[in-house]
Amino acid sequence: MIKLIVGLGNPGAEYAATRHNAGFWLVDQLARMGNVTLRNETRFHGYAARANLWGNEVWLLQPQTFMNRSGLATVALARFYKVMPDEILVVHDELDLPPGTVKLKLGGGSGGHNGLKDIAAHLTTQQFWRLRLGIGHPRNLLPPGTAASGQHDVANFVLKAPRKEEQDLIDRAIDQSLDALPELIAGNAEKAMMRLHTAH
């Protein structure tokens, strides 16, 4: 059962449309569906709201600490409302999946994602759920002849807006996620994975 959904991203208008903010986009959709407004909650270092989604009360959170401090906000809200790590779903951009692909998993490493790394450090466990929204990798998406091998290029890539065709695919993956989330929130993880991983 999921009691807290954390969308990862960076605060500020200049980052709103960037690939690294894909987690924010999904949480924005959930807030609209739940007819709630995310409000600045200083004690939780982010924008938060309690929503009734598919008959379940769920907290929505967008940390406003910048990506590499996401754990601060996540743990502040989780501790206050006594949410266990395996009741948390973190929604984040995933370089290792192409745009349009979305995967759900419990636990595992951070895959170089600083937001996940910080959340795991603050929770002192990696046993929380992750919804991985594919944004692609610069080596696969940039035009031929464009250098995109170093860490610097990846950092630039995630802080830029997707091209239109990529954005359309990411939006479709978010829609697929919304189809599977009722099962996960209700505690039917296997059904949620089946629905998500067999969606076309």
From Swiss-Prot:
Recorded superkingdom: Bacteria
Chain sites annotated for binding tRNA: Y15, F66, N68, N114
Active site: H20
EC id: 3.1.1.29
InterPro entries the UniProt entry points to: Pept_tRNA_hydro, Pept_tRNA_hydro_CS, Pept_tRNA_hydro_sf
Positions bearing the site annotation: Stabilizes the basic form of H active site to accept a proton: D93
Annotated site (Discriminates between blocked and unblocked aminoacyl-tRNA): N10
Cellular component aspect of the GO annotation: cytoplasm
Enzyme class: hydrolase
Record field: catalytic activity: an N-acyl-L-alpha-aminoacyl-tRNA + H2O = an N-acyl-L-amino acid + a tRNA + H(+)
SUPFAM superfamilies (UniProt xref): Peptidyl-tRNA hydrolase-like
Any one GO BP annotation for this protein: rescue of stalled ribosome
Subcellular location: Cytoplasm
UniProt keywords, alphabetically: Cytoplasm, Hydrolase, RNA-binding, tRNA-binding
Any one GO molecular-function label of the UniProt entry: peptidyl-tRNA hydrolase activity
NCBIfam families associated with the record: pth (TIGR00447)
Family: Belongs to the PTH family.
PANTHER family assigned to the protein according to its UniProt record, in alphabetical order: PEPTIDYL-TRNA HYDROLASE (PTHR17224:SF1)
Protein name: Peptidyl-tRNA hydrolase
Organism this protein belongs to: Ralstonia pickettii (strain 12J)
